[in-house]
Amino acid sequence: MDHNLQVTLVEPKRSYFTCPFSNLVLGGLKQMGELTHSYENLQRRYGINVVHVAADHIEGTSKIVVLKDGKKLHYDRVIVAPGVDMRFDLIENYGPDDVESMPHAWKGSASTLRLHRQLESMPDGGTVLICPPALPYRCPPGPYERASLVAHYLSQHKPRSKILILDAKEQFPKQALFSAGWERLYGHMIEWFNGSAGGLILRVDAKGMAVETEFGSEEGDVINLIPAQWAGRIARDSGLTDETGWCPVDQRTF
């Protein structure tokens, strides 16, 4: 590392939970603690200044990051990693409070732990609903990797259970590979329904643990509803997104 550079990381959380590999927790192959890391090495080994305060917005013309506590950080170069925010406005009867009973487990450790505990407490012979959104969203193959690892857990601990994937899409990434693997490893445990076959979620009943599609209502003992997403708020507030709500990317250079 060039010691002439002064690097500051603005991050409100005291520890970092890796969303990559979080499906291994749901599959019973890793513990939450194995995916949780502190920022101490960045400070101690590399001299990076870690500020545990959320960034509020970026003033691009003056090259300033304004923090939630009002402090301002001047920069020569800023790298923005806004993450994603959930869209709770696209499904009827669905809001932020419903993630308690229908966890998305798509960001943060608390939601992943909640889904993990629901899988542990569901009865053998129960039904898991996994409801992926339409593209684009973070990690397009993720819901299908998740279905695979949940099936791994269920096949060992609750083998009479089933997984229904109610998908807003007509097809999904790496579909042929996933479908072949599901059939070979788990038989008929996993069923996938595309949007035109009843996979598109129109509204939810969080108290009744049910989702409604144009073909009727589907109940689940566990419902992993993954909502539509867009770029994190700081990107939207700082003018970094386009009309889609996402940050445009030059695919030639990324």
Which stretches of residues belong to each language-model region?
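Beta1-alpha1 glycine-rich phosphate/pyrophosphate-binding loop at the start
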Residues: 1-49, 134-176
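A general structural motif
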Residues: 4, 125-126, 160, 220
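A conserved beta-strand/loop capping segment in the N-terminal third of enzymes
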Residues: 42-93, 126
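A Rossmann-like FAD-binding core segment of flavoenzymes
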Residues: 45-58, 62-65, 73, 151-251
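Glycine-rich dinucleotide-binding loop and its adjacent helix/turn
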Residues: 82-157
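FAD-site-proximal beta/loop scaffold in flavoenzymes
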Residues: 89, 93-122, 219-254
